[in-house]
Amino acid sequence: MDAKQVRERLIAMGINFFSADLFIAYHRERPKIWEEFAAAALALCEDGERRISAKHICEKIRYERQMEKRGEFKISNSMVSLYARVFVLKYPEYADRIVLKEAVGPKVEAA
């Protein structure tokens, strides 16, 4: 899924245009965040976790990095829910396990 598709799908999920564009720019500058987020989320799903919050995923990464002395995991709190939405788009088989809060923007049909 390319950046344009991600943007369109986020907007269809109720994320406003500004936040979707901000997320795409943020991701382009920090692609490693997605790699770690997706890997941690997949591990939790495959371990049988039934309800997983995006905040929990980020805190798990932060904790593991601290224990392994790999440096801090820095992610803007305003981006956490967007990473969760992208995870659900990329891995729809786990959509029922990822807790998503209601987006406050208007829902529109994706192109």
Please name every model-derived segment.
Residues 2, 16-20, 53, 76, ...:
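Serine/threonine-rich low-complexity intrinsically disordered regions
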Residues 21-56, 62-68:
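Positively charged, polyanion-binding regions of nucleic-acid-associated proteins
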Residues 55-96:
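Charge-enriched amphipathic alpha-helical scaffolds
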Residues 1-35:
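Intrinsically disordered, low-complexity serine/threonine- and proline-rich regulatory segments
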